[in-house]
Amino acid sequence: MPETPRRFSRISIQSKLLLMLLLTSVLSVAVVGAIGFQSGRESLRESVFEQLTLIRSAQARMLEKAMRDLTSSMVVYTRGSTAEQAIAAFTAGYDELRDAEVPPERQQALVEFYQRNYGETDADADRDAAQARVQALLPRGNSQRYLQTTYTLAADTPEDRIELDDPGDGSAWSAANAQYNEFFRQVIKRQHSADALLIDARGNVVYSVGKGIDLGTNIQYGPYRGSNLAEAFKEAMNSNSLDEVVVRDFDTYQPSGIPTAWMVSPIGPAGNVQGVMALALPVDNLNRGLTFNGDWQGAGLGKTGETILVGPDLLMRSESRLFLEDPDAYRSDVVAAGTPVEVADEAIRQGSTILVQPVDTDAVGQALQGATGTLITEDYEGRRTLQAYSPVQTAGLNWVLVAKIDVAEAFAPVATFTRTLVLSTVAIVLVVCIAALLLARVFVRPIRRLEAGAEQIGAGDFDVELPVTSRDEFGDLTRAFNQMSSNLQTKERQLTEQRAENHRLLLSLMPEPVLERYRDGEENIAEEHQDVTVLFANVDGLD
């Protein structure tokens, strides 16, 4: 016989009953808990996915509306007479500056400005390379040198340059700036843009609100000829529609020092386009919308959720929530997830993840193929997240929008339920143990009484009658036991009476001494008595 069944057979009924009750209760709680856990997890997952989908859809609508509003505003600006008059005045003033005198000391100051801001850095130890870079950026034409020495060097901060209307040099360009600078300054303020440019038909940047190092340069032949702005300029100039607004995705733009996207629209009457107006896409304003102005929890994204915008190059077009909240934690997490250290350091150096942080995830890959859906996968921070994704195609841009939240946070109620279930199970087991112990004692009590009664009968005491305390099988068994005990008692009494009768009969046939010898096993008995002599006696049927 196997050892386990043998051991189990030696366990008392009370212990077996206790084990059965305990096992039944634990299995019941486990089954109910497992069903509740799975059902709760599925319901919660669907609820979170639905929430993420709603947020993603709302953000997509926000982006599409923002781009529509921007393109509509661009058409209004460029079709208005102010833009036409302004580009004509700035172009004329720009051409007039070709022969303007730029003192050598001002030219040297401009060179030093470029060297100080665009020359050697800590990461660039090659001075020759730094000097070559500065030389490539330095103004080539006299108009550019004049404007930058008069405006770019005249203010210490970009904000001061924007506010500078007239330095008092008496030039036609400064007169145009004094007249129109306020108009374009209000444009960038209303649109939350960093800069607005006017570029004539030849590609000269004849005006800039920010008056940075792109002021006066030629966008087709100068140092920024390979920029996204140059591409947008060419497309806008070749457009047959004055209502055309060309949008170019984010790309590095050295004059601003940050990734910049452009909206460009032609200026001038049909058939006589004078140039274009270029507006830097208001990235800060878009990011405020994408980051809910820092109130992610109020938007329903908890402590770890966010929405991110990704381009076809798999680089971010928005700011990372973790980067904004804790740059050190951002660096640690993304590097651990596979982002190169130098990329994470570059994001921290620039103070932005736009066009720096790669997001090569399953959700982004599927959305770039035109799919919309939800899934659970790792994000760019290496965390398991629930993600809702979709493509966002607006104004000619091919972006991907992802709303996500960490699995740990999303399923926190399930984890709480699991902990509660475990604690409840432990409590139930304890209660069941106590209840089972009491029930087992009640259950085996009739068996104990029967056992004691059987021992009495075995000891020869047939005068046993057990109390019948129930009407169940134990009651029936007790009644049967009592009946058996009564029968045995009757048999014993009858047997005793029969023995007494036999004894009297034998005494009537023989003397008592002879009877005793016969009972002791003697068969041939001869003995002399005064009253009678027994010669032979053969008694059959008597014990």
Language-model segments: what does each one mean?
Residues 3, 7-42, 46, 50, ...:
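Extreme N-terminal signal-anchor transmembrane helix of membrane signaling/transducer proteins, especially
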Residues 18, 22, 397-402, 407-458, ...:
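Cytoplasm-proximal transmembrane signaling helix
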Residues 42-44, 286-295, 388, 405-425:
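Membrane-interface helix-start motif
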Residues 96-113, 208-219, 223-243, 285-391, ...:
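Intrinsic low-complexity, intrinsically disordered coil/linker regions enriched in small/polar
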Residues 146-281:
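Extracytoplasmic/periplasmic ligand-binding sensor regions of membrane-associated signaling proteins
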Residues 449-469, 476, 515-517, 523-524:
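Short, charged helix-helix connector/hinge segments
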Residues 456, 469, 473-498, 504:
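Amphipathic coiled-coil signaling helices used for dimeric signal transmission
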Residues 501-503, 521-543:
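Catalytic NTP-binding/metal-coordinating core of nucleotidyl cyclase/transferase enzymes
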